[in-house]
Amino acid sequence: MDKRNLRSKKTIKDALILLSSKKAFIDISVHDLCREAGISRSTFYNNYHSLNDVVAEISSEYMEKIRGKNLNREFFESLTRDGNELKLLVETGVFGREFSFYLKDLMAGDDSKVKRGTRDDVLLNIKTLYHAFGVFGVLQNLSRMYGSSYYEAFRSEAIDTLMELSGTLSKE
C-alpha cells in the first residue's frame, strides 16, 4: 500500500474516532465522516466499503496494541489513555468480541496469536476479567440507551474500579 493510501486511512480512522466522541456511531454517516476528515467520498470508498470496515481496522490495530500487556493493572491503565478509541469499540460491540477471541487464543495455547502472557496469567486474573466484561457491558448498554454523555460520565470511574479490583484480586 502506498503512502497516500496509508495517510488517507489514518485520516479516516482519526476522523471516525473524533466523530464518535461527539455523537453515537449509529448516527454517523459516510458523508459526516468525509466532511470531518476533509476527504471525498471516492477516497473513502477507495479504502473501505463501509463504516464497519473502518471500525474493524481500528479494532485490529487496538487489539495489536493491547496484546502482550499484563492482564491486570497495566492493561486497565492503557484503557484510560484510549478514551475515544475505546468508546467507539465498546459502543459498536467490537471490543468485547475481539477481546473474547484473544482470551480464547490465550487459553487454547495458540501462542502464534498471543505475543506475551501465559494461560496462568489469565487463570490468575479470571475474576478481574469477569468483572471487566461486566463493566464493559454496562458501559456499552449505557452508551446505546442514553448516549455518549452517560458513557463519558461513568468510563473513568469504571476504569478506576477495574484497576482497584485488579489490584485486590491479584493479591488473592
Where in the sequence are the language-model features?
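Basic, helix-initiating cap at the start of DNA-binding domains
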Residues: 1-23
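The alpha-helix within a helix-turn-helix
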Residues: 34
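Hydrophobic alpha-helical connector segments
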Residues: 67-96
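Amphipathic alpha-helical packing segments from all-alpha helical-bundle domains
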Residues: 94-139, 159-167
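C-terminal peripheral helix-coil segments that are non-catalytic and often amphipathic
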Residues: 144-172
